[in-house]
Amino acid sequence: QMCIRDRNNPWFMILTLIGSFGSLGLVYWKRHNHPTNLYMLGLFTSVESVALGTLVSFLDQTIVLKAIIVTAFIFLGLTLFTLQSKYDFSHMGTWLYWSLLILVGTGLVQMFFPYNHLFELAYSIVGCFVFSGYVIYDTWLLQRRLSPDDWVLANVSLYLDIVNLFVSILRLMNGSSDE
């Protein structure tokens, strides 16, 4: 069998993780070289879709569908709010950056400890807030600060915001259904 079909193969997840970071680096490196930037964006999107597809293959279909719908409504609402808002969201960048670092660090530390349902719940809720903040911040950057030449980076930023918000909502819904 191919390793893609074997969901329990840890090497597959490691390869998709390496592929995600590698293709993200290539997108950043070639962001101003047209049409190479399109190929790199396609590669990044493909690798991310394989990783996300593998993740959702472990979960109940109804939970995945609910998470997709909730993510879509949250993203649409936050985007519309940001586009019509007169607020300056530039101050959010530093807070979001440090929140993300704390979230990643906490997740890495948690890998070495036994599963804790309350920690998973809190981690998912914080993730939802952080990535909702990133949707607002990156939409504001796209609208007010980024030049038209930076559309590839803006695309990747919003894509990662949506994917990470979806994964946080998915973790939250999956954790609440396990009770």
List where the protein language model places each region.
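A hydrophobic alpha-helical transmembrane-helix feature that marks the membrane cores
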Residues: 1, 5-179
